[in-house]
Amino acid sequence: MTAIRPGSVTFENVTKKFGNFTALPNLSLTVEPGTLVTLLGLSGCGKTTTLRLLAGLEHPTSGRILIGGKDVTNLPANERDVSMVFQSYALFPHMTSLENVAYGLESSGFKKNEARERAEEGLKLVGLGGMGHRLPAELSGGQQQRVAVARALVLEPQVLLLDEPLSNLDARLRRRVRTEIRELQQRLGFTAVYVTHDQDEALAVSDTIIVMKEGGIAQKGSPRDLYEAPASAFIADFMGEANVVPCEVISAENGEAVIRVAGLTHRVPARNAQPGPAQLAIRPNAVTLQPQAGGGFSGTVAHSAYLGDHIEYEIETEHGKLFIVDPAVEQSLPLQTDVSIQFKTRGLAIINQ
């Protein structure tokens, strides 16, 4: 294999219709070379349609798609400089790992010996050197996934597309393989567009996350940006659970905001806060509970569940039920206990109205 040639991706005002249904209304986005960008969202948000448009498996109703600065809008899939790792891996069960990786090369016109050499190099890249003789059935789910990645990479695409690549793995293996994918992408420096509905997966592997909703972009940013500075209540709750309550921003300067919640003032990170009515997103682990209510932000324990290293509470308040995670397992609060709710310094985000 020669050096990886990471390419950029650009969607310019792309609309995709299926009959009378508009799946993507005027979508514009960019992916910088050498980055891993995740399209994240609920089912039906448009992320898979976006990936299929990029792969050439669908064509836009209007707009332009560019890969590496080249307009590929009307090019068929086989003429685009991309490779795709499918959800099912799509390995041939009767072929060895080496033969699976070499197959695409031979189909692209490489001589058999050269294809095998490049396939062996590809398997080494993904940590499967010496395992080329094994059939897919003789490999673990994670190893099969790496064979699929190797098969895509040996074609030296400008962009690697990954469509829900971990969905067929169990939870423990998912964590390990997502780490391997991220390490491989950072080591080789290829551009990747990754589709998933799993927020933890997106947070773990991405340089940039694009959260999609109803065919548009709800928010784009780094994993930290989306988690710590959500642009809306939807993003706050989608990127890890959040309790959203009304508040008033009294002032915001020098990176700190003074807010009023339930009659009490608090100081929290300002980020992009503007004075006036707002909402406060509260992560479940961003508060402490004290077993005595005394005005201010308080509530009553409506439900509790012991989960080993933490206790989950539902606290009934004037703003509805709050979901709270408390690591203090040694002092469980009984049901109907009145509690005061105190904010920590992290895990709070102001959402402007």
UniProtKB/Swiss-Prot annotation:
Top-level division of the source organism's lineage: Bacteria
Domain (ABC transporter) ranges: 9-239
PANTHER family, per database record: SPERMIDINE/PUTRESCINE IMPORT ATP-BINDING PROTEIN POTA (PTHR42781), THIAMINE IMPORT ATP-BINDING PROTEIN THIQ (PTHR42781:SF1)
SUPFAM superfamilies assigned: MOP-like, P-loop containing nucleoside triphosphate hydrolases
Subunit structure: The complex is composed of two ATP-binding proteins (FbpC), two transmembrane proteins (FbpB) and a solute-binding protein (FbpA).
Chief site of localization: membrane
Keywords linked to the UniProt accession: ATP-binding, Cell inner membrane, Cell membrane, Ion transport, Iron, Iron transport, Membrane, Nucleotide-binding, Translocase, Transport
Entries under InterPro entries matching the protein: AAA+_ATPase, ABC_SmlMolc_Importer, ABC_transporter-like_ATP-bd, ABC_transporter-like_CS, Mo/tungstate-bd_C_term_dom, P-loop_NTPase, Transp-assoc_OB_typ2
Protein name: Fe(3+) ions import ATP-binding protein FbpC
Catalytic activity, as annotated: Fe(3+)(out) + ATP + H2O = Fe(3+)(in) + ADP + phosphate + H(+)
Role: Part of the ABC transporter complex FbpABC involved in Fe(3+) ions import. Responsible for energy coupling to the transport system.
EC annotation from Swiss-Prot or TrEMBL: 7.2.2.7
Membrane topology of this protein: Peripheral membrane protein
Native source organism of the sequence: Brucella melitensis biotype 1 (strain ATCC 23456 / CCUG 17765 / NCTC 10094 / 16M)
